[in-house]
Design a protein with these regions (language model features):
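Flexible "arm" and connector segments at domain edges
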Residues: 1-102
Length: 102
């Protein structure tokens, strides 16, 4: 029997999908700080996957993790985004800063 170690946060249906394939998996429910840290790790993982394969599905994975982080931290992302845009703008003008002289 081959055992693969993952030690990472997975989507809710992954354990059932694995078991439906006749395999066994070992999971636990992450709570509090462990869950928040694993969400941060997952955000990096999903962002890297999007970087390597920019498509709607990969970006949706990033968004799913962002939504989970927003929920566990009770952050109002729309308010934070609007504040940041009012102060510094968005990316609509597509400016690329090349240099600054002092």
């Amino acid at each position: 029997m081959t055992i693969k170690k993952y030690d990472k946060l997975v989507r809710d249906k992954i354990p059932s999908i694995i078991e439906s394939q006749g395999k066994k998996c070992k999971v636990y429910v992450a709570v509090d700080e462990d869950y928040r840290n694993r969400l941060k790790d997952k955000l990096l993982e999903e962002a890297q996957e999007f970087f390597e394969n920019p498509c709607a599905e990969e970006l949706a994975d990033v968004q799913e993790v962002v939504n989970a982080l927003q929920y566990v931290h009770r952050w109002d992302l729309m308010r934070a985004r609007n504040k940041k845009n009012a102060e510094r703008g968005a990316f609509d003008h597509r400016y690329v800063l090349q240099e600054v002289s002092e």
